[in-house]
């Protein structure tokens, strides 16, 4: 009776897909270009794509006129194509690939949920993924990771489809199995062209460890590793070999070692402790992390072995990626995005059964605790947000009130609905709160803080003063990408040492330089420091930047 009654609140499968698509379009695409590209990644990636288009070199990428070997080209090709279709390198055009592949990733999650459990589980899981904090944010930002997550998820979907087709089905399914297993390798190849070796390491590790745990040796033999990896290499090397031939040994060393092996083993950027993700991931997967422990416990407790295999696949998927990046020296929260579909599916299955079956033990022992925790967090956050804003940014207090009302009101509404045991309404209330909060933040708050985050404003100061033939330099670790993009100046001279800066400012002609205010302040006390003119001072991201000139 419970399942029959609750099934009426869910639409048909094709309607579920359309609802997910429409939901993501509103959440990710509407007013996507309302704020500028923000440091450090967005304007740099946009500049790489623009130099590809302007230089008509789609093989060897450049930024600031120099060879760029940090990332493979696929994401930059997509930005270039998007900018061509949108009529220029606007914020919307540059972010469009991330929004597109974020949306497609939500739809892939729906299909995996449908494959493993039911279309209803897939529908709920898609909503969970779309409204998780980090996934939603990266789907509206010109970062590579939403695109990478799509291709790794597509690869694993093909693997799962191939594996399930191979269980107890006749030879009539062989062509479909072949198509699925080769789709697995094609997905890995495209993921590799998006972000390097991690694109094939993650799906391959997940699939092999899953088969190893199941002791399915025949499955490993049927994976067509030789022909599949040959197809993978053909796709990847069709770009990489010409790029190495053009870039030479230096490009080979940079792409093969510095940004892969060295970055993983030595962590020359973003070095963090091994336990970093244990406290970072829960924040990134809010609000759904509250229900993840219950989802894992519920998955272990299920009695049907075939259903356990589905849960095991999701557990291996998420666990392997979590462990892989935890062992890396360099860590960022965005690196874990490829595991978000897996944990969303776990939580989606929990919620599907929670609202449709009698899970008395889990309702009271696990989910009740998670719900009260979420209610408490929402209530505290709703009270704290306006208080913090009033203390530090008093003029912005009115803009914090809608978020405060949303959090406090949502918390109280959850409590009332929980009292009446309307669990489906609680789920959709959480979805609505997250969607409303994210939409308000990205469409109201982001444009509001844009003048303090964007490099465009100080770049306008440069463009209004610099004349043809005059040079622009940048001192210390500030990257050139944002200023290349917003000034259109290529190249910008990179000054790493004080001696370089001093020599630059002593040029006979007029020159301009960007540097941090703290560096400018300390350099003024140096003996022999030339007289310079302070032209502008602005906040760019978290940096206090000044523009100076020697004339």
Language-model features, listed with the residues they occupy:
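Membrane-embedded architecture of ER/inner-membrane glycosylation machinery
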Residues: 2-3, 14, 182, 186, ...
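Membrane-integral, polyisoprenol-dependent glycosyltransferases
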Residues: 1-364, 484, 537-538, 543-544
């Amino acid at each position: 009776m419970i399942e029959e009654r609750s099934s009426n609140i869910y639409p048909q499968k094709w309607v579920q897909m359309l609802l997910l698509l429409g939901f993501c379009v509103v959440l990710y695409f509407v007013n996507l270009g309302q704020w500028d590209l923000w440091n450090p990644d967005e304007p740099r990636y946009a500049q790489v794509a623009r130099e590809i288009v302007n230089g008509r070199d789609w093989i060897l990428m450049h930024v600031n006129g120099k060879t760029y070997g940090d990332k493979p080209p696929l994401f930059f090709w997509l930005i270039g194509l998007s900018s061509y279709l949108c009529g220029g390198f606007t914020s919307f055009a540059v972010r469009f690939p991330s929004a597109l592949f974020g949306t497609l990733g939500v739809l892939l999650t729906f299909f995996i949920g449908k494959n493993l459990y039911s279309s209803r589980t897939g529908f709920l899981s898609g909503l969970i993924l779309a409204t998780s904090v980090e996934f939603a944010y990266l789907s509206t930002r010109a970062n590579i990771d939403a695109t990478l997550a799509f291709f790794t998820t597509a690869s694993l979907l093909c693997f799962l489809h191939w594996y399930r087709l191979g269980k107890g089905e006749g030879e009539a399914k062989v062509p479909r199995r072949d198509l699925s297993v080769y789709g697995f390798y094609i997905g890995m190849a495209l993921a590799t062209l998006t972000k390097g070796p991690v694109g094939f390491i993650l799906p391959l590790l997940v699939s092999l460890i899953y088969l190893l745990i199941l002791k399915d040796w025949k499955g490993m033999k049927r994976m067509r590793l030789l022909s599949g990896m040959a197809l993978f290499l053909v796709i990847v090397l069709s770009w990489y070999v010409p790029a190495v031939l053009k870039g030479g040994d230096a490009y080979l060393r940079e792409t093969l070692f510095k940004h892969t092996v060295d970055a993983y083993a030595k962590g020359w950027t973003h070095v963090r402790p091994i336990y970093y993700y244990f406290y970072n991931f829960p924040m990134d997967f809010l609000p759904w992390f509250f229900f993840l422990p219950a989802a894992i416990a519920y998955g272990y407790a299920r009695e049907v072995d075939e259903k356990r295999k589905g849960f095991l696949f999701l557990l291996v998927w998420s666990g392997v990626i979590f462990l892989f990046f935890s062992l890396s020296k360099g860590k960022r929260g965005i690196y874990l995005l490829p595991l978000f579909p897996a944990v969303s599916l776990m939580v989606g299955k929990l919620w599907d059964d929670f609202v449709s079956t009698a899970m008395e033990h889990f309702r009271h022992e696990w989910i009740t605790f998670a719900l009260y925790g979420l209610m408490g967090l929402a209530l505290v956050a709703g009270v704290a947000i306006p208080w913090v804003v009033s203390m530090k940014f008093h003029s912005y207090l009115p803009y914090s009130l809608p978020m405060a009302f949303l959090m406090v009101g949502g918390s109280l509404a959850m409590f009332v609905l929980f009292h009446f045991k309307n669990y489906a309404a609680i789920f959709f209330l959480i979805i609505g709160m997250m969607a409303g909060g994210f939409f308000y933040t990205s469409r109201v708050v982001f444009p509001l803080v844009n003048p303090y985050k964007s490099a465009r404003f100080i770049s306008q100061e440069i463009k209004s003063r610099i004349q043809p033939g005059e040079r622009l330099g940048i001192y210390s670790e500030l990257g050139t990408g944002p200023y290349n993009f917003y000034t259109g100046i290529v190249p910008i001279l990179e000054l790493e040492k004080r001696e370089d800066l001093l020599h630059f400012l002593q040029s006979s002609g007029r020159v301009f330089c960007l540097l941090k205010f703290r560096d400018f302040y300390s350099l003024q006390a140096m003996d022999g420091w030339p007289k310079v003119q302070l032209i502008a001072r602005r906040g760019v991201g978290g940096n206090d930047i000044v523009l100076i000139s020697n004339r």
